[in-house]
Amino acid sequence: MSDYEEDEAFGMDGAVMEEEVDELEMIDENGQSQQGVSHPGEPSTTVITEDVASSKTAQSGKAVAKEDRTTTPYMTKYERARILGTRALQISMNAPVLVDLEGETDPLQIAMKELAQKKIPLLVRRYLPDGSYEDWSVAELI
């Protein structure tokens, strides 16, 4: 047994080692900002509810019209994970479920079922380098 066995989170000088992560803004259904983790190299995206997207106070910047979108209609694995996690959290906090449950009790499984049927009422906001953004509904993404 060593003297430092229980001090696994400390560096050589005894200081606490902290992990650095990039922050990504997430807006919940009340329009309040939440913090999340983004992955290096991933374009900046935000998951928001449809009613927040229609309000002018949600974010500054200019929206791109649907017919002028430049990003692909494919959902990235990071967007998928973010959408499923957000929706599972909503379901666990007693949000209405939009699919037949058929005995399902796990919020993540219910969220996956909603995603498969394209019934998740969320938008993906993709920010572009010029400061504008594109809103994609989950039903539009492949």
UniProtKB/Swiss-Prot annotation:
One of its GO terms (biological process) is transcription elongation by RNA polymerase I. Residues 30-45, 50-60 have a biased composition (Polar residues). GO terms for molecular function: DNA binding; DNA-directed RNA polymerase activity. Transmembrane segments: none annotated. Residues 1-21, 26-45, 50-71 are annotated as: Disordered. It is found in: Nucleus. One of its GO terms (cellular component) is cytosol. Phosphorylated. Pfam families: RNA_pol_Rpb6. Belongs to the archaeal Rpo6/eukaryotic RPB6 RNA polymerase subunit family. Component of the RNA polymerase I (Pol I), RNA polymerase II (Pol II) and RNA polymerase III (Pol III) complexes consisting of at least 14, 12 and 17 subunits, respectively. This is DNA-directed RNA polymerases I, II, and III subunit RPABC2. The lineage of its organism: Eukaryota, Fungi, Dikarya, Ascomycota, Taphrinomycotina. The gene is rpb6.
